[in-house]
């Protein structure tokens, strides 16, 4: 079988190649679900799992095997260190695959000669707790869950910056509109964070 993120990326690359030569601008959203549970080695390509199969991952500095008293039952810590290690191996295997797929898509954009005309965003909706604060999964405002990467690239138009600031997914649409010199409609949640 084909790993879903690989297939999605292939479809996105095909879309880019088909639309790259058109006059009209296009918009593409690629929503890859990984890294995400189930944390089983049959849920990631073997070559990526093999990269991490013997890697020990230390617990987070704020790891606790005491359950968060305010956490939902489904987010309680798994009190099995070996299982937690295996889940982390699979998480990093999936992350490595995601990195490869994002790299393929960016290369496709460049190969089609539209990199300087393309605003590229990479982000995530949440992180993963893996025992930090005695929790698993997401749905908390702890840093491990709430702090996610946000990369925005537009060669020649947006200068390279490394910012440490709070923003939300609702800021993406107004920021894209701002970069495109399109007025943000009144009542839209979020802020235009374009430079």
Residue positions per predicted region:
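Short, intrinsically disordered, charge-balanced linker/junction segments flanking boundaries
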Residues: 186-195
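Active-site-proximal cap/lid insertion segments
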Residues: 1-9, 13-170, 178-187
């Amino acid at each position: 079988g084909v790993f879903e993120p690989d297939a999605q990326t292939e479809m996105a690359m095909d879309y880019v190649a088909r639309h790259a030569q058109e006059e009209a601008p296009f918009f593409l959203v690629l929503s890859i679900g990984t890294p995400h549970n189930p944390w089983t080695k049959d849920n990631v390509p073997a070559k990526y799992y093999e990269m991490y199969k013997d890697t020990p991952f230390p617990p987070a500095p704020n790891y606790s095997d005491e359950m968060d008293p305010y956490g939902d039952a489904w987010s309680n810590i798994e009190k099995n260190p070996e299982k937690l290690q295996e889940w982390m191996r699979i998480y990093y295997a999936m992350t490595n695959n995601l990195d490869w797929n994002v790299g393929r898509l960016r290369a496709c954009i460049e190969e089609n000669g539209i990199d300087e005309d393309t605003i590229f965003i990479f982000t995530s909706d949440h992180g993963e707790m893996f025992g930090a604060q005695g929790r698993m999964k997401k749905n908390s405002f702890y840093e491990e869950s709430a702090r996610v990467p946000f990369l925005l690239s537009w060669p020649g138009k947006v200068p390279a910056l490394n910012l440490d600031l709070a923003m939300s997914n609702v800021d993406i649409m107004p920021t894209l509109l701002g970069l495109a010199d399109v007025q943000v409609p009144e009542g839209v949640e979020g802020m235009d964070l374009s430079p």
